[in-house]
Amino acid sequence: MWLQNLLFLGIVVYSLSAPTRSPITVTRPWKHVEAIKEALNLLDDMPVTLNEEVEVVSNEFSFKKLTCVQTRLKIFEQGLRGNFTKLKGALNMTASYYQTYCPPTPETDCETQVTTYADFIDSLKTFLTDIPFECKKPGQK
């Protein structure tokens, strides 16, 4: 009987001292990736029927040299109309990810221009397709 109690006590002590989670901590929240993919699917599925003019960042976006990321996300979010307002959450989540986990991008020379809504949506698709899912560390190529 005492052997059973000793074995039970050993199991309890061992289970209490065991790690409660994986020793590998996840440092990259990937919710923004799913949000970007969902936004791209919605953009592909919805026809552009508005003839409004909206503002976009006129500087060309390049994944090699990220500039105006927060400005672009803010302007895209503000420019959404109609059914496309469903994308606000995805853009907000992406902005939050980049603001929290990535080095700041230059935001000073972010000139804007007025364009058609169809061109605005095309610019948004291109931006979401080209934006890297993962941050580059300073000095990383």
Curated annotation (Swiss-Prot):
| GO aspect biological process, one term | cell population proliferation
Family annotation (InterPro entries): 4_helix_cytokine-like_core (IPR009079), GM_colony-stim-fac (IPR000773)
A Pfam family annotated for this UniProt entry: GM_CSF
Main subcellular localization, coarse class? secreted
The positions flagged as glycosylation sites are: S22, T27, N83, N92
Q: Which cysteines are joined by disulfide bonds?
A: C68-C110, C102-C135
Task: Indicate the segments annotated as coiled coil, or none if absent.
Answer: none
Example of a GO MF term: growth factor activity
Q: Which subcellular locations apply to this protein?
A: Secreted
Signal sequence extent: 1-17
* Chain ranges passing through the membrane: none
Give UniProt keywords alphabetically: Cytokine, Disulfide bond, Glycoprotein, Growth factor, Secreted, Signal
GO annotation, cellular component aspect: extracellular space; granulocyte macrophage colony-stimulating factor receptor complex; intracellular membrane-bounded organelle
Give the function comment from the record. Answer: Cytokine that stimulates the growth and differentiation of hematopoietic precursor cells from various lineages, including granulocytes, macrophages, eosinophils and erythrocytes.
Q: How does it assemble?
A: Monomer. The signaling GM-CSF receptor complex is a dodecamer of two head-to-head hexamers of two alpha, two beta, and two ligand subunits.
Q: Which family does it belong to?
A: Belongs to the GM-CSF family.
Question: What's the name of the protein?
Answer: Granulocyte-macrophage colony-stimulating factor
Tell me which species this is from: Mus musculus
Gene name as annotated? Csf2
